Amino acid sequence: MVDWTDPERSAIVGLWGKISVDEIGPQALARLLIVSPWTQRHFSTFGNLSTPAAIMGNPAVAKHGKTVMHGLDRAVQNLDDIKNTYTALSVMHSEKLHVDPDNFRLLADCITVCVAAKLGPAVFSADTQEAFQKFLAVVVSALGRQYH
């Protein structure tokens, strides 16, 4: 269990209320697939991922990006129990999908970049970034929990 300070909790929940999950999710997943092309192997059913433009315009990428962000919403709603909230997802990603757990960190970095670019430094201050990155690190840890 993570001990969140009141300012961290406030920063995470406040920032989350400003994030458009339907905008940031597709951007972040597309960025991951472009910047870390080896991650594309997990998305072979998504169709054309051959160029950055194809990835950015791919409806399956957009849909899954939204799914990822809605999954993060579950973590925001369960800040005190993120590990248990993500148990089933961790099992699925490790045992069924065989996703390298480091890919979760890479996606978290892409989410951070997209949020910062969208909201700017007035909203995404250093203190807010610190709390958000701590939150994402806890999510990444929870997703990697079932790996051996």
Curated annotation (Swiss-Prot):
Superkingdom of the organism of origin: Eukaryota
GO BP annotations, alphabetical order: hydrogen peroxide catabolic process
UniProt GO cellular component terms: blood microparticle; haptoglobin-hemoglobin complex; hemoglobin complex
Positions that bind heme b: 64, 93
CDD domains in UniProt: Hb-beta-like (cd08925)
Ranges of residues in domain Globin: 3-148
Record-level Gene Ontology MF annotations: haptoglobin binding; heme binding; metal ion binding; organic acid binding; oxygen binding; oxygen carrier activity; peroxidase activity
This protein's UniProt keywords: Heme, Iron, Metal-binding, Oxygen transport, Transport
Tissues where the protein occurs: Red blood cells.
PROSITE patterns registered for this protein in UniProt: GLOBIN (PS01033)
InterPro entries xref list: Globin, Globin-like_sf, Globin/Proto, Hemoglobin_b, Hemoglobin_oxygen_transport
Function recorded in the entry: Involved in oxygen transport from gills to the various peripheral tissues.
Record-stated family: Belongs to the globin family.
Subunit relationships: Heterotetramer of two alpha chains and two beta chains.
Protein name per its UniProtKB record: Hemoglobin subunit beta-4
